[in-house]
Amino acid sequence: MYMDQRLWPYRTPGIPDDLFIRDESIPITKEEVRVIALSKARLREGYMVIDVGSGTGSISIEAAIQVGSTGRVYAIDRDADAIALLRENVRRFSITNIEIVHGDAMDILPSMPEVDAVFVGGAGGRMYDMVRVACTRLRSKGRIVVDTIMVESMSSALNAMYDLGLEDVDVTQVIVAKGRRISSGTMLIARNPVLIISAEKP
């Protein structure tokens, strides 16, 4: 058994944010953005996945559910506090097919196995190089998915993808507004736009 289904007894992605243990100093890929990012990766049972800049672990955990007991997720983060929080969330969901790796992804990626999908949620200002190195771990027809709030990071990711000759390059801007109950009814509170850049290795 690769997860305890009592907390989230569904295969559908989109675990509510409040089910994760949170820390305001550590980023989380929000529920609606996460669903779109996961769809861009086109995961299947048994796939191998790398999550760079895993943060809270929301993408890693959702991906682990999608790839099932025969798949595996490698969650990489260089921040010790993020790694500790990730471990808490992995325990909370009783996920057994995630391998947590503490360190700089630029140093770690070259020794990682080939995978079917890579998520990049943090590059530390080195997005161009991160995408290039991450793609060395992708199998043919493997997919890379980058999410960022910075237009500069989007530009760097796109440049790397085009320079590498990746196919099916796609940019999606996600703008989410959530309802909040007030005394006279319900108002919508907008969240920051997020850019999702995805592509496929030939």
Regions found by a protein language model. Give the residues of each.
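Short beta-strand element of Class I
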Residues: 70-74
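Glycine-rich helix-loop-beta junction characteristic of Rossmann-like nucleotide cofactor-binding loops
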Residues: 39-44, 65-66, 136
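Class I SAM-dependent transferase core
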Residues: 1-50, 81-93, 188
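S-adenosyl-L-methionine
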Residues: 76-114
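Conserved S-adenosyl-L-methionine
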Residues: 53
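C-terminal substrate-binding/active-site "lid" region of AdoMet-derived donor-dependent transferases
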Residues: 133-195
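Short SAM/SAH-binding signature in class I
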Residues: 114-122
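Conserved SAM-binding loop of SAM-dependent methyltransferases across substrates and taxa
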Residues: 56-69
